[in-house]
Amino acid sequence: MEQRVLKTLEYDKIVALLIDKASCTYGKEKASELIPFLRLDEVINAQQGTEQAATVLRLKGSVPLGGIRDIRGPVQRARLNAMLAPMELLDIASTVMAGRRLKTFLLDMCDDHELPLLQQQAERIEGLRELETEIRRCVDENGDILDSASLELRQVRQEIRQLESRIREKLDQMTRSSTYQKMLMENIVTIRGDRFVIPVKQEYRSVFGGIVHDQSASGATLFIEPEVIVEMNNKLRELRLREEREVERILYVLTEQVSFAVEALVENTEALTELDFMFAKAQLAWSMKAICPRINDRGYVNMRKARHPLIPREVVVPVDVELGGEYQAIVVTGPNTGGKTVSLKTIGLLSLMTMAGLHIPAEEESEMTVFSSIFADIGDEQSIEQSLSTFSSHMTNIIQILAKMDDKSLVLFDELGAGTDPTEGAALAMSIIDHVIDSGARLVATTHYSELKAYAYDRPEVINASVEFDVQTLRPTYRLLIGVPGRSNAFAIARRLGLPEHIIDVARGSISEEDNQVESMIASLERNRKSAEADRLAAKAARQEAEELRTQLEEERAQFAEEKNKRMERAEDEARIAVQLAKEEAETIIRELREMMAEGMEIKEHRLIDAKKRLGNAVLELEKEKVKKPAKAVRATQIKVGDEVMVTSFGQKGTVLEKVNNEEFLVQIGIMKMKVKRDDMHVQNSIQQKPQAAPYTSVKRRSDNIKMDLDLRGYNVEDSIREIDQFLDDALLAGLHSVSIIHGHGTGVLRKGVHEYLRSHRNVKSFRLGGQGEGGVGATIAELK
């Protein structure tokens, strides 16, 4: 891509915006080198990288890119075993940690989302935790080597501190001494040339003694090292040299460790460069409200509500452009008001951005193509008195474009043919457009020559376009109108500015009838377009209103369904509670009767009537709380005396004893006899197939919890009889036909007592000792009636 074209279309300004979005030096450098790709696969890959990074920003809002330093220089020096400075080591540690943090962040995102390009780069980053830990163990945030870096360093620094303390103590004694105070300029201890000194007045030089290391600017003060601390200062100097050697040794060790990780650091650097660059593109897209366009290599462009990215969003006017489908060229006609050039640059710049892997400010579903090259001849016409040199300059550029273009090129001409005689200029413009079309290239050209309006109508590959102009404000609206040629609007503008009407009429009369017809036709087209646009907007508004109404109805329907479900759940909960209460009431009745029987009490008639009444009330409560009755397996007219039936409200089996009337039957349920409505039961032995499932509320059968055997081992005879009596009642209510009573071998007393009780029990049909696998003589099997 020619650099002149990139500059003409202001691509360099887009790159500057991209550089500003990068977080580190690596990303900024890569952004500065970005040029459009020329291969479809490269463009698609670059766009996918931008889209995946944009997805992360949409989901997370930000990305941990802080802490990345430019470590390429230190890494290369470490490769050569050149000692690294502490701050360089800190930069390496910071970058290692930043890379590891970014890797963890991205791989966590990749667990939930498809982000293959980001994942590929993240997986290149090596953690290098040991290297970072070792650097931070030895170097603090200010770049100083820590005492913990080595035992030798800790020891020598401790000696230095102790010796410095002794020296200061010695000098403090001198400054406080009355003998020396009159000789001192100030009672302080200071350092000159790494040696402790005190300020002495010039006149006491010979009296004070010692070594002079410095003097004040006036010469009145001498900084003297007293003789009593010379040896101590010498020792201090030796210790500091030891410290320097140890620090240097530590830095060499750390540098060596960096050299071992050079390849990994280079790989990390490259991965961080790619990631920072991708997120810079995503940040730019976010700031522009840009989208990822569809990409093709057919030369087809369909921009929807495309905006020039360098014009503020609050003032830019979107344009719709379709090129390369039905039409190969667009000729934008009309007066040179400036709006045409903006449209031309928008088409060119967005094409460059697409090919560079950048998202474009347009609506979703916009489609762009990959051009082999983009050429542009764009220059503002300053006046009607353009010089021949300007025309020659443009023509030289056009000649070069025509020589280089091919069938996959995009050619942009601004004010084609301007700067020369209008008749000749228009003829040249039409001939140049013909040549570009014949080459197969895509073309967008602007012109103010009216001759090209009719030309565009005559060529099926070419379509007219214009930039809308508001005659009232005398300003272009910058809306690109495809299919509508531009009008000069000269008469309308003159009238608006106050030119006398008779002058305008004379001017209009001097124009040929054909030109007047063309202008009238264009005016008619413009009126029809505005009418169609108004209808389209009205239809769009109606469609949007209908869509909003549909969405509202869907939401209301969903809310209604949710509320209905909640009410059903509440009803079912209430029914379950009522069922449980009714069940407990029924069990209480049965338990009371059982206790009365166990105590040998005669059950009076009024007691039995009261129990039946209470049980009947419980059944009625169950029936009231049913959500839905199950399908009847057999019609009520088919129920007859002797049938085994399932009583729905209790979930219990029973036997029909007699038919009371057409609505009720007398049913034996365990030890109880009760009236049951015909709709509350069905014949158990007549069900041939499972009825259609229907939700209903029922009592939970006791057989869900009752056991088939009763273990009496350890009980006496009296307690055993009470347990057997309750066990048999539960078994009968559960519909069991036989049970096992375990009494053990023992002395036989318990077995004998069990047998005597079973023999007299009214609901025991027969009993026997258990066989093999049934407990033998230690168990008794009872058959129930």
Swiss-Prot record:
Alphabetical UniProt keywords: ATP-binding, DNA-binding, Endonuclease, Hydrolase, Nuclease, Nucleotide-binding, RNA-binding, rRNA-binding
GO molecular function annotation: ATP binding; ATP hydrolysis activity; ATP-dependent DNA damage sensor activity; endonuclease activity; mismatched DNA binding; ribosomal large subunit binding; rRNA binding
Disulfide bonds: none
EC number from the UniProt entry: 3.1.-.-, 3.6.4.-
Entries under Pfam families matching the protein: MSSS, MutS_V, Smr
Keyword ATP-binding carried by entry: yes
Cross-referenced InterPro entries: DNA_mismatch_repair_MutS_C, DNA_mismatch_repair_MutS_core, DNA_mismatch_repair_MutS_sf, MSSS, MutS, MutS2, P-loop_NTPase, Smr_dom
Binding, ATP: 334-341
GO biological process: mismatch repair; negative regulation of DNA recombination; rescue of stalled ribosome
Superkingdom to which the source organism belongs: Bacteria
Record domain Smr: where: 710-785
Top enzyme category: hydrolase
Function: Endonuclease that is involved in the suppression of homologous recombination and thus may have a key role in the control of bacterial genetic diversity. Acts as a ribosome collision sensor, splitting the ribosome into its 2 subunits. Detects stalled/collided 70S ribosomes which it binds and splits by an ATP-hydrolysis driven conformational change. Acts upstream of the ribosome quality control system (RQC), a ribosome-associated complex that mediates the extraction of incompletely synthesized nascent chains from stalled ribosomes and their subsequent degradation. Probably generates substrates for RQC.
Similarity remark: Belongs to the DNA mismatch repair MutS family. MutS2 subfamily.
Assembly behavior: Homodimer. Binds to stalled ribosomes, contacting rRNA.
PANTHER family from the UniProt entry: OS10G0509000 PROTEIN, OS10G0509000 PROTEIN-RELATED
Protein name stated in the entry: Endonuclease MutS2
Organism of this sequence: Brevibacillus brevis (strain 47 / JCM 6285 / NBRC 100599)
